[in-house]
Amino acid sequence: MKTALYTIFRCTNYGAVLQAFALARTLRGMLGEDAVDVINHRMDPRDTHLLGKITNPNTPWFQRWRNRRKFAARYFRPDLFEARRAKTVELIAKEVRPTARLYASPQELKSLQPYSTVVVGSDQVWNPLLNTDFGCNQYLATSLPDRQDRVAYAASFGVSELPETCRGEYAAALRRFRRITVREETGAAICESLTGRRPPVVLDPTMLLTAEEWHDAVVRGASAAKGPHVAAYWVRTVSQADVDALAAFSRMRGVPVRLMSAGPLPKLDFPKEVVPFVDADPFAFVREIADSDAVATDSFHGLQFAAIFRRPFAALGDLHDPGSNASRLVDFCRRYGLGGRVQDIGSFRNGEAPHVDVGELDEQALEADRVRSLGELRALLSSRP
């Protein structure tokens, strides 16, 4: 029987699509190109995460018309973001290669054909604040057939503490997994508190591929970015203070900043030093970082790709908010000899120059973890009942 991958990918978020691509590619490399299905499923009832609110055929026409007017008033070049969306849809079909059947709701997964194993993860599949558009976190896999074997690779909770209100639900669901691996130490602690077992911490799927493998997959043969630049990627909504700080960073580095974001860019005053790159699809995002002189990011996956391509980086997070994604950035930097490298984004906005370097990266430890993580993934597959 085949193996199935159940993960986040029907969206325009770069990290989500790229981790799904990397894990599917790795699984297919281990088991065979035709031995792995990526379960094609909606993340919300109208498929808005992938299809958006302007051209989405699942949204009534009058709402699309109203949304188009709102977007035109609020966002910078929404037409380019819609172009990015179209390119992302095409890339997912070609590179992730999900199943022909689209499961419109978690309830439909009860009719899922039997698989030898369903692999859940990676990314923030178990974030209690996300993935609840259907009234529950679908990646807890409670809608899978009861007898279906399930494991988790590099699952992330995205928070350092689980709210008390959902601990019972999570504990019951996670105990049904035969084996779990997580992406962060904080996730390991949460799992241990819920199940009594501390799972191994493994690398994000994007780091299972080497820089050479990423070059072969998405960089080689494609046109490079136009000249030296800083690749900036913001997962939170970009503010004018962010743009102004990036302009100062550009002047400090002596090269322009090419700015990408997880969602549409608001209408802001973009100085000449900051060039919006709104229509970059996930593979263009990788190329931007691979070809950059340095990286500035508040994103976990922005940091991952800076490390993969050994680019000097400024990692920025809200260090005063325990609910922010900063814990993931801090955890990664601490594990690989970059402790203290995550700068508070408020300080960055206030003009404090970031520490930009990659020389301290413990490459030996990172490579050892890559080999170990691949071994853990093989163990998930080989020890099935």
Model regions and ranges:
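Active-site anion-handling motifs in enzyme catalytic cores
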Residues: M1-P385
